[in-house]
Amino acid sequence: MLEPFQILSICSFILSALHFMAWTIGHLNQIKRGVNMKIRIKGPNKETINREVSILRHSYQKEIQAKETMKEVLSDNMEVLSDHIVIEGLSAEEIIKMGETVLEIEELH
């Protein structure tokens, strides 16, 4: 049988997780397409960059067909650091498509 303190700890954890999810969803819903965003992506190896560029390229498929062209477009807005990549100028929809690789989202003013 669980002790009252354990039950309280579990409930507190669940509420914290729900609050974080609600805050994240609410924050992303407020951001309209085209707002300038900065994201940090973990694991800045060649495969990660190629995968993220492919995801972004899919968003821009009508305008930009080649992955190499997209890399050139992103290169001005991409900063590769030791443990993550920073890409600026993305919309909320593009960030959501990246899923689990996103570490941090910051709205640029």
Swiss-Prot record:
One of its GO terms (cellular component) is host cell plasma membrane. GO terms for molecular function: channel activity. This is Matrix protein 2. One of its GO terms (biological process) is proton transmembrane transport. The lineage of its organism: Viruses, Riboviria, Orthornavirae, Negarnaviricota, Polyploviricotina. It is found in: Virion membrane; Host cell membrane. It is a single-pass type III membrane protein. Influenza B virus genome RNA segment 7 encodes the M1 (AC Q76ZA3) and BM2 proteins. Normal translation produces the M1 protein. The M1 termination codon overlaps the BM2 initiation codon in an overlapping stop-start pentanucleotide 5'-UAAUG-3'. Termination of M1 translation triggers reinitiation on the BM2 AUG in the +2 open reading frame. The record marks W23 as: Seems to be involved in pH gating. The record marks H19 as: Essential for channel activity, possibly by being protonated during channel activation, and by forming the channel gate and the selective filter. The chain crosses the membrane at residues 5-27. It holds the Pfam family Flu_B_M2. Residues 58-83 form a coiled coil. It comes from Influenza B virus (strain B/Memphis/12/1997). Residues 28-109 are intravirion.
